[in-house]
Regions:
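Class I SAM-dependent transferase core
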Residues: 34-126, 137, 142, 157, ...
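Conserved nucleotide-cofactor-binding alpha/beta core module
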Residues: 118-234
């Protein structure tokens, strides 16, 4: 009988031990999960504040007035469009490398080119040079339809996946040479080019709707933002801002050599 009693006592102790262990594990798990959620929420709040500071101090104060552009820049999480190692620098007003000898444009230039294109909720936009996908995301926050061409297949795939994951459904990306635009989807109310040829491609002007604007950096070492507006009688062209973009490759480079 004593032996049976001892066995029962041992079993009860083991059962209590298992119950206590399960309780401690569940409590620790909840605490860890809660800590991770809290850390994630704090990081999200931090990124929102960084975007607000970027817009107010680097963009609005430099003369960007279009509230749709400012709201789009506050909304798009730029840190997701740069390498993880550079995420803490994402909201500096600087271009950053994204691999493949390409860069993401500085926030002010993105805002400037977007505002210059004069977008509305009904605008259909073509972007030449998807790159990281950041400019395309800003455009998609404002315009009704965005089409973007990237000459590097790896970047096109990476950007498409990221933008899909972020929920952009009014944006279409394809891999190809953007020098001749996207004639199947023309005309466009605005065309933004994020790589610099040494001349304005004629095909892009032809794909503008009347009243539409082409915003493009033009030049080799010395580049300027060039704005071409299509009118009933032809086009008007102005140069506005000195910039430094990566050169446009593909057919643009071949034609540069031929000139």
């Amino acid at each position: 009988m004593n032996s049976l009693h001892q066995i029962k006592c041992r079993l009860l102790r083991w059962l209590w031990f298992i119950v206590i262990l399960a309780f401690v594990s569940a409590t620790l798990g909840t605490l860890v999960e809660g800590s991770l959620i809290y850390a994630g929420e704090q990081n999200a709040i931090h990124r929102i504040r960084q975007r607000e500071q970027m817009v107010e101090k680097q963009i609005r104060q430099r003369g960007i007035k279009d509230e749709n552009v400012l709201a789009a820049m506050k909304s798009v999480p730029r840190h997701l469009f740069v390498p993880h190692s550079l995420a803490n620098r994402a909201y500096e007003d600087n271009p950053l490398p994204i691999g493949f000898d390409q860069t993401i444009s500085q926030p002010y230039i993105v805002a400037y080119m977007t505002e210059t294109a004069t977008l509305t909720r009904e605008t259909k936009v073509l972007e030449i040079g998807t790159g990281s996908g950041y400019q395309a995301a800003v455009l998609a926050e404002i315009a009704s339809e965005v089409f973007s061409i990237e000459i590097l297949p790896e970047l096109a795939t990476r950007s498409r996946n990221l933008l899909n994951n972020l929920g952009y459904r009014n944006l279409t990306i394809k891999s190809g040479d953007g020098y001749r635009g996207w004639p199947e989807e023309a005309p466009f109310d605005a065309i933004i080019v994020t790589a610099a040829p040494d001349h304005v491609p004629t095909a892009l002007i032809e794909q503008l709707a009347v009243g539409g604007k082409l915003v493009i950096p033009v030049g080799r070492l010395q580049q300027e933002i060039t704005i071409v507006t299509k009118t009933d009688n032809g086009t008007s062209t102005v140069q506005t801002l000195p910039v430094r973009f990566v050169p446009m490759t593909g057919e643009a480079k071949v034609r540069e050599i031929d000139r």
